[in-house]
Structure formats: structure tokens, C-alpha cells
Amino acid sequence: MIQYHKGRDKNMYTKAELLNLYNMDLDALLNESKKYLKDEVEFCSIINARNGKCSQNCKYCAQSSHYNTEIESYPLMEVNEVLEAARDSQKNGADRVAIVTSGKTPDESDFDTMLDMIKTLNKEGIKSCASIGILNENQAKKLAETGLVRFHHNINTCRSYHPEICTTHTYEDRINTAKLVKKYGMELCCGVIIGMGESIEQRIEMALELAEINPDSIPVNILTPIPNTPFADYGDKIDEENILRTLAIFKIACPEASIRIAGG
């Protein structure tokens, strides 16, 4: 097993070390990751509060206006609609409820409505989360002041592979949003999508970049290929064994974070 370098943080691995772990016997790797697991499971739920017509060209996404995915698009839901959906989620066992919207970043009017949604959920005693795109400093500050508990914003992939995924915003845009969330004291949920054609080495890069960001929660989405997107035929880019290896590596690299398994 890997020996830690003297004088460094015990959780900071090198790329070579994580790659060695990734390629070891699967049972041994899973046993190593179990050292960091808690005997508990969390459930979260999302409310798709605005759907479709996104200006960004993320190659995996059904909501991008760049691809003819034939999804139903609708504008931002009303506050009372979100509240009813959140109550249903809570009754069904969700530990927290996230307001999720399509689009790069909300305009001022929609953002004010989102703040009202968060206030309403907080009054109801529902743990609030939001996934509303790339933030500026003023938006991050207002979300924190409103009492948002957690903000979700994925890095989606590693820095070296980002240009293969999206060209309408930068990797740094995503990193800056994560930094703003932490700056204003909110919990950060920040993860990736795997199975998009990235290499094993690039999955290791994802783990290291997430370890640097230090989120509270890491959703690991396994790509669900969407017809008529550029990744429509990517259903065979990762198998079950490599999914398990990736999950184990993420837990080893980020032992304090909750690892969430998702489809995306």
C-alpha cells in the first residue's frame, strides 16, 4: 500500500499514486476505499424548476439549445409549485431538496424568484440546495445571506478534457463558482460525469482537482447518452468495473466528502 510522504497532508496523493491504486486488484482497491466509508446513506431530491433552452453547448446535455433533443421546455416554476414538490420529496424520504434550473446563469428577475424559493423552503424546515449555474460574487453573497445551505455546481470533467465537452464557457468559470460558494460559507456539492470518453488518467485528474476544491459532497454521474447529442453513442465508454474503480479512487482522494452515485 502507498506510504505517505513525510510532512504532507495524508490525504494528498500524487497522480502516479492514485493511478497505481486504480490499477490494483479490484477487491483490494475496494477494501482500501472502505476504510473511509461511513455506515450511512443519504438521499437528496431535485426539483427541475426550469427546463431546456440552455445557451451552452455541453455535448452530453438534453437541455442544450444546440441539439435537437425534443425535450419539453418550460420557464421558471412558481414559488408555490416548488414548495409543493419539495414537500412531496421530503415525505418520500429526501434529506435535502435542490432547486435545479437550466441555463448558464439566471437573470436578475429569475434570481430574485429563486431567492424567494429558498426562503420559502427554509421557513418550511426543508434543507435547501440550489443548482442554478455559474455565479458571480454578488449572487453568491445573496444566496448565503438568504440562508441557502448547499450549492451544487459540477466541474463535470478534468481541466484537460473540458474543451472536448464544452466551448461556451471555461473550466475556470466552474472553478470560480465553486470558490465563491466556499468563500461565502455555503456547503459545496461538486462532482463529475464519467463515461464521456475521458481516459483513466483523466479520471485521476478529476479526483485530484476535486481534492483541491474540497467539496462536502461529490456526485459521480455515469453518462446516460441522450439521442441527438454529440455523445449519443457513448453508452459503451465505461464498464461496471471501471465505474467501481473510479468511485473507490474518488473516496480515497476525498475521504471527508460524501460520494453520491447518479445518472446524468
Q: For each predicted feature, which ranges?
A:
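Active-site-adjacent loop and "lid" segments of alpha/beta metabolic enzymes
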Residues: D236-I238, S258-G264
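Core AdoMet radical
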Residues: H66-A85, S89-A178, M186-G191, D216-N221
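Conserved, mostly hydrophobic/aromatic
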Residues: D25, C58, I99, H153, ...
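Conserved C-terminal portion of the radical SAM core fold
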Residues: K123-G125, R150, E172-P230, L244-R260
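An N-cap/entry alpha-helix motif that binds or orients negatively charged groups
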Residues: T14-C44
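Glycine-rich phosphate-binding "P-loop"
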Residues: T101-K104, T229-D239
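Short, Lys/Arg-enriched N-terminal segments with co-localized hydrophobic residues
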Residues: M1-N11
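Canonical Radical SAM [4Fe-4S] cluster-binding loop centered on the CxxxCxxC motif
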Residues: R8, F43-E81
